[in-house]
């Protein structure tokens, strides 16, 4: 079972690396694609059409928040997986919490350093904080569940 847990952590880290390895234009287009699909789904549900100009305005307003929420989500899941893995070592609650956070913080820093070498991308300390917000949420939620069992 530990092998599967390690595998899931590694796969998730590779996924984060993959997204970080995208040139800025590709990354931006991926975010815009998510926004357009979401808007299209909502407009179908509420049966309302929007103009191209309105769509562009919505994309402009929502692209950055969508990208930051993606950071939170990716590191939230990473923290869940890392914490789940560490729990299999029967560590104390405080050790699980500390090691999970440390692993996520280190990976977040390495991810931002990696982006310095990608076309059109830059490393951002703000993104490290945003990533780690997701990490803290993930560790907090799973550890709360661990404590209650």
Language model features with spans:
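"…centered on the first transmembrane helix and the immediately adjacent amphipathic helix/loop
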Residues: 1-73
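Membrane-helix interface segments
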Residues: 2-4, 91-99, 121-125
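Membrane-water interface at transmembrane helix exits
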Residues: 18, 70, 83-87, 111, ...
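Interfacial helix-loop-helix junctions of multi-pass membrane proteins
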Residues: 108-129
């Amino acid at each position: 079972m530990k092998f599967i847990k390690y595998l899931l952590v590694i796969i998730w880290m590779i996924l984060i690396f993959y997204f970080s390895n995208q040139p800025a234009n590709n990354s931006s287009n991926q975010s815009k694609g998510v926004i357009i699909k979401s808007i299209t789904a909502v407009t179908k549900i509420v049966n309302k059409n929007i103009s191209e100009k309105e769509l562009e305005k919505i994309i402009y307003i929502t692209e950055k928040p969508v990208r930051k929420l993606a950071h939170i989500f990716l590191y939230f899941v990473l923290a869940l997986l890392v914490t789940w893995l560490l729990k299999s070592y029967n560590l104390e609650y405080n050790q699980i919490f500390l090691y999970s956070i440390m692993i996520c913080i280190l990976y977040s820093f390495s991810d931002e350093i990696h982006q310095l070498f990608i076309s059109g991308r830059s490393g951002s300390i703000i993104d490290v904080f945003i990533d780690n917000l997701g990490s803290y949420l993930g560790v907090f939620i799973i550890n709360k569940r661990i404590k209650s069992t």
